[in-house]
Regions:
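Non-catalytic cap/lid and distal C-terminal segments of serine-dependent acyl enzymes
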Residues: 1-183
Length: 183
């Protein structure tokens, strides 16, 4: 969409002054939730859908130890290699593609010295998703995980698209995945 923010802190004008989504989520929102809600701020998982799935993957990989479990639904796995990511990254980070690498889940996983989530990462992907081939690239993230020994369960579902019914169908599995890792 036109409001796609990609869960990063912008480096380009006019966005850089106020578009600080990564800082807001990690430095402000999570501590605020832990302070005001009866949750254990040390046992937090992260998940998301589509661009939110990209956010879950990149925030988890950019902030080692902050999130204890990780999952995603149809995430944008290699934004520096797809039109959505190229447009957003150019606008928020500039034309220098090296800056984009810091916000690309596939590149971030390739650069991990060891598997950051030994209990595994769960990703669900619909095979009828019209964005799969051009925008999402889960196969690239899968290869990056395999290269460093990161356990990944990438479930591919025939006849499921990119919509919320897809998420609704498998959200209980993601809740179980996080509960197992966090309890």
């Amino acid at each position: 969409g036109i409001g796609a923010g990609f869960y990063l802190d912008a480096a380009q004008t006019p966005w850089r002054t106020h578009w600080r989504m990564e800082s807001y989520l990690v430095q402000e929102l999570l501590p605020l939730l832990a302070q005001h809600l009866p949750i254990d701020g040390e046992r937090v998982g992260i998940t998301g859908h589509s661009m939110g799935g990209h956010g879950a993957l990149t925030l988890a990989l950019r902030h080692p130890g902050r999130f204890k479990s990780l999952s995603a639904f149809a995430p944008i796995c290699a934004p520096s290699q797809c039109p959505w990511g190229e447009k957003a990254f150019t606008g928020y980070l500039g034309a220098d593609r090296t800056a984009w690498q810091e916000h690309d889940a596939t590149v971030l996983m390739q650069n991990q010295p060891i598997a950051p989530y030994p209990g595994g990462i769960l990703i669900d992907q619909g095979l009828a998703d019209k964005f799969l081939a051009e925008q999402l690239h889960p196969h690239l993230f899968e290869a990056a995980c395999q290269a460093i020994g990161q356990p990944l369960t990438l479930r591919r579902h025939a006849d499921y698209d990119h919509g919320y019914y897809f998420v609704q169908t498998f959200v209980a599995d993601h809740l179980r995945h996080h509960a197992q890792a966090l309890l």
